[in-house]
């Protein structure tokens, strides 16, 4: 199961910041979910909210600040302690930082149509110029935006972000031609996951922070989880995989030891005994 770092590594570092992505990257994370908003000067920047209030010491809408002004803010306000000031980066800065990311979910929040139109153009241009068709999907809970970006380039992969079971988000995703179904983990069922797969969609679920829930979702057949703690989550699944790989060897060693013990005690199979 694929592990996406939520806003970089929201539970481990300042969200949607370069140091947060770098932190997760150094621990082996190559899949990220992040949020894209348009700055005052028309540049896609990485921030979850349409305002800067929650994550910085500043106030007001992201649209009221240039990318340079956003970069100069301190985006540590809503996170655990972090030793150095970190600003709000641009999408291009993130893409320049890494050349081997495997996949990005670029989420776009509902906003004014005029701004979304501009952001749609900017994202299309970035994906085309950097050839991110296979390595990025544009996701949103706004069907209008998903239709618009697909209208600009039918090869851009899209995903519907679904928080509730109604009004039938999987049917909406199907009508939009989405390749990704990005659902709140609490609304998923095996039937829903199976149906999404039959319709050719990758099922990604958010925000999953407990191992118990991750394992249940794995049983449902989800393709990926989005978590605030990607490095510890990745460590858990890597350790489990290594343990499973070592299991046959351990069983073989134990079997050999038991056979040797039986031989030492004079135990042997008589003719006619044993497996048929």
Show the residue positions of the predicted features.
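Phosphate-group recognition and catalysis centered on beta-loop-alpha active-site segments
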Residues: 1-276
